[in-house]
Amino acid sequence: DLIGKDAIKLRDGKQVTEFQEGILPWALRNPCAIVFDEYDAGRADVMFVIQRVLEADGKLTLLDQNEVIHPHPSFRLFATSNTVGLGDTTGLYHGTQQINQGQMDRWSLVATLNYLSHDAETAIVLSKAPTYNTAEGRRTVSQMVTVADLTRTAFMNGDLSTVMSPRTVIAWAQNALIFRNTGYAFRLTFLNKCDELERQ
């Protein structure tokens, strides 16, 4: 649980109910960072709890415990989101919702991260599939990343409804090793996820 919950514990041989602190109160008290991944897929009731922590003073009130937690000076809160809080307008991120403007306004910094450079993505794929770290293998991985770049351009132009992520390129490289066939691995890793008309 994010805030905490009542839990049954043994004390002096007897069962007692005690509040067990959740991850958010614990993190607030300590010099640490907490990261909420896929933040825009969170439930509204959870979002409103986090919204209180995003205020300028960042206090969290535990009403049932009659306690106000002030954040540690080095506490930090981060979140990741594919939709930047705008909701899913493309149909690619089903299950996400638009984050209300009051919530978005409380995030003091928002950074947008686009795809990596060709060379950086190639290096990551090579680190995940080190078998390719030969002259021929590096050329193959570079060509795979070029194909991924082409799918991203086609997606932005509205020509494709599916995009190739770095995760997909890594899977393609690994599957090509398993099947010993780059084309067949491409079909299984990416092409079969595309709309039938787009496959042609």
Residue spans for each PLM region:
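C-terminal regulatory/interaction module of P-loop NTP-utilizing enzymes
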Residues: 1-200
